[in-house]
């Protein structure tokens, strides 16, 4: 089942491991590490990233939708 993550982007529900808030130093370090290894996908369309989706393939996807809203969509 596809879940809308904002601005015309969707992900497969079965491939998402977790949704976390985009704040904190540890998250910034993790983002920069994955950006260097080409495993970061920006789905914000230029807007501020509010949440991070962690995928089963070790990729992370940045979303402009709040984590609480995404959690409701995954239910």
Please identify what each model-predicted range represents.
Residues 1-11:
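Short aromatic-glycine motifs in intrinsically disordered, low-complexity regions
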Residues 11-14, 54-56:
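Short glycine-enriched loop/turn motifs at secondary-structure junctions
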Residues 13-21:
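Phosphoinositide-dependent membrane-docking surfaces
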Residues 20-24, 64:
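Ordered, soluble secondary-structure elements with a strong preference for glycine-centered loop motifs
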Residues 26-38, 42:
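Compact, glycine-rich, soluble single-domain proteins
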Residues 45-50:
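A short, compositionally biased
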Residues 51-75:
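C-terminal structural segments of small proteins and small subunits
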């Amino acid at each position: 089942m596809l879940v809308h993550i904002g601005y015309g982007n969707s992900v497969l529900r079965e491939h998402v491991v977790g949704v976390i808030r985009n704040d904190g130093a540890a998250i910034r370090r993790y983002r920069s590490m994955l950006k260097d290894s080409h495993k970061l996908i920006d789905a914000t369309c230029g807007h501020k990233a509010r949440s991070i989706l962690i995928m089963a393939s070790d990729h992370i996807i940045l979303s402009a939708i709040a984590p609480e809203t995404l959690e409701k969509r995954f239910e």
